[in-house]
Design a protein with these regions (language model features):
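Active-site-proximal, structured, solvent-exposed surfaces of multi-pass membrane proteins
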Residues: 1-188
């Protein structure tokens, strides 16, 4: 299956604006790695008494994704939270043999669009004894590039009568040829 971060990025890149006889991809902007300070890659172990805290710089105006690589396989159900940018997300691993067990060891956790240049991120163990990770990285893309792509799409003739609000999408989408229509519905 496609990596969650790449899936999101691919969906944004798949948005199409019809041009004169061609189709152009609406750019989502370049995916960028941000600078992480305050933790060593060898110290990525969560226990009940030890959280992982670090700072990320260069965040303002960017959608932030935390990538954790190589999560250890726990011997019991283990859950941890990720807090940063005013959001808290939780992630759970089940032990092998459990119905909820997954081979996915590299979660990608979205933390929204940052209003500040510097973010403090904290991982805390909620359930279980311990979980460790091989490494982490923080990726982002500039939200202004995404907004410019959305604005271009909203001006496209085939979307002229489409409107949306916080709870829905209304209107009709017309196309000169048959094919796929991709909709990305944001949620928080």
């Amino acid at each position: 299956s496609l990596d969650p971060l790449l899936r999101q990025y691919a969906m944004l890149s798949a948005m199409v604006v019809e041009g004169t006889g061609t189709a152009e991809s609406a750019s989502a902007g370049a995916l960028e790695r941000l600078s992480v300070t305050g933790t060593q890659q060898s110290e990525l172990i969560l226990t009940k008494k030890k959280s992982i805290q670090f700072s990320v710089s260069g965040c303002k105006g960017k959608e932030i994704y935390l990538r954790l690589y190589g999560a250890s396989v726990p011997d019991q159900t283990t859950e941890f939270s990720v807090s940063g940018n005013g959001k808290t997300r939780s992630y759970r691993y089940a032990p092998k043999g459990d119905l909820m067990y997954s081979e996915q060891r590299d979660p990608c956790i979205q933390l929204g669009v940052a209003g500040n240049d510097e973010l403090e991120i904290e991982l805390t163990l909620l359930r279980g004894r311990e979980i460790s990770f091989d490494s982490l990285e923080v990726c982002s893309y500039d939200i202004s590039d995404y907004e410019a792509s959305v604005a271009a799409l909203q001006q496209a003739p085939h979307l002229a009568d489409v409107s949306y609000d916080e709870n829905g999408l209304r209107g009709s989408i017309s196309s000169q040829t048959g094919g796929w229509v991709f909709l990305s519905l944001p949620y928080d």
